[in-house]
Amino acid sequence: MSDQLQTTDLSRVHMVGIGGAGMSGIARILLDRGYQVSGSDMKESRSIMALRAAGAQIQVGHAEDNLRLSGEMPTVVVTSFAAIPQDNPELVGAREAGIPVLRRSDILALLLQDRRAFLLAGTHGKTSTTSMAVAALQAAGQDPSFAIGGQLNRAGTNAHNGTGEVFVAEADESDGSFLSYSPEIAVVTNIEPDHLDYFKTESAYREVFEKFAHRIVPGGFLVVCLDDPGSAALAEELIAGAEEGNPLPFTVVGYGTAEGCDAHPSVPPAAIIESTEVTAEGTVSALRLTEEVKKAAEEAAGTYSLRVAIPGIHMVLNAAAAVLGSVLLGADVDKVIAGIGGFDGVRRRFEYHGTRQDVEVYDDYAHHPTEVAAVLAAARQRVEARGGRIVAVFQPHLYSRTMNFADEFAEALSLADQVVLLDIFGAREEPVEGVDSRIIGNKIDASTDWVFEPDFSKVSSVVAGLVQPGDMVLTIGAGTVTMLADEILLELDRGDRG
């Protein structure tokens, strides 16, 4: 950790973009620890209202005067560099006043300092796996602190300042900022090219995960998914380097299905999913914890029945990672397994919104081709029993990602029966001439019907006109598409009333 971070004064923290999922969680923990918090954002939100109720001073809109919301100038300003432009008047004013401007990850690194850090990294699955780990540790009688990119359904929050010694958090690789952390347990769920607007090359993206692994504290664990080629390759390279005379101060272990573990024999498997069965209550798996866990948990080795309520093998893999990491931290394995069984999900991760006219409506945050494919495969498991179809309402996120992965998005969306494509949600990016969602649609398999509806206000009525009893509608994407799930239900209500 840099000398600047070591000496950072957190007594008065001003957060630019305080309403975001990651920023609001850090604000909540800072408030719980007794620091003064102020901030600003472009629009009102439930997160902002909750933070105000907890004592934060927050202004909607950005202006230099916001720096004085708490009555005096802040000791530090925090922002998300990816989301907030550097000419923001509050950032400019802070620099002119000599106030340190830090990233969210820098502040999280400070909050992690006196805790045992259990960090979840990977291209996909961070939020779900982090949330499962929290549920597991809470069920084991611990009170972990946590900072998550989504809101836990049961807890109704995305962050908590716990009394226990463990801090569970997502480690976001999108701008390399997770290199600020020093975890005891680091899980890597998968590594696939993403965020190429920042990293430029696939090799640079993969290399940042190797650097992250070397941030693990001596005696800690790197836990990798062996069903994913990218994370398995990371483990294999580290182990090979150790065998060639570059010893590692941490232990590398894997988790995955029996097939995944068998495919990478050089990586010692610590958690093996030996069988799975889809039931009305969810997916039930036989999870074997091997002798590898005895390095940290002498009594935990054995085979357990693991129930995961949320559909999809990707969720079973996430659950296995959460179990393994929790057990390596010393949590009681039986209580951990029970905690996973009671986990009921995270907002915007295969989140059920309702049923109208025998049409189920779900919402999911998936915005990378692999995530889209995983959620549609999970939906297929559920919809087959109903005899209906999958109607995917997809809003691509970022022009750069749409251009880089148009083929892969088309392949993933071809798993649906009907696709409704919205205009691209550009977020921080400017529109690119000639690039819209049709570059995906034109490559979707001929067996899947698709329509392009650029008028956001018309999408819910378009969807209502396409669905049939027994169908499942999934609104998918990281942008404003989430607003449509309830709108579609209302549109179906209107149709039901005639």
Curated annotation (Swiss-Prot):
Reading the lineage from the top rank, the first entry is: Bacteria
Q: Which reaction does it catalyse?
A: UDP-N-acetyl-alpha-D-muramate + L-alanine + ATP = UDP-N-acetyl-alpha-D-muramoyl-L-alanine + ADP + phosphate + H(+)
Q: What is its EC number?
A: 6.3.2.8
Q: Does the keyword ATP-binding apply?
A: yes
Where is this gene product found? Cytoplasm
Q: List the disulfide bonds in this chain.
A: none
Q: Which GO terms describe its cellular component?
A: cytoplasm
Whether Zinc counts among this entry's keywords is no
Which enzyme class, named as a word? ligase
One of this protein's Pfam families, by short name?
Answer: Mur_ligase_M
Residues the record lists as binding ATP? 122-128
The primary site where this protein sits is cytoplasm
A Gene Ontology biological process in which this protein takes part is: regulation of cell shape
What are this entry's molecular-function GO terms? ATP binding; UDP-N-acetylmuramate-L-alanine ligase activity
Q: What pathway or pathways are given for this protein in its record? A: Cell wall biogenesis; peptidoglycan biosynthesis
**Listed transmembrane segments:** none
Tell me the keywords, alphabetical order.
ATP-binding, Cell cycle, Cell division, Cell shape, Cell wall biogenesis/degradation, Cytoplasm, Ligase, Nucleotide-binding, Peptidoglycan synthesis
What HAMAP family is this protein classified in?
Answer: MurC
What the protein does? Cell wall formation.
Q: Which family does the record claim for this protein?
A: Belongs to the MurCDEF family.
* Name of this protein: UDP-N-acetylmuramate--L-alanine ligase
Species in which this protein is naturally found? Corynebacterium jeikeium (strain K411)
The gene it comes from is: murC
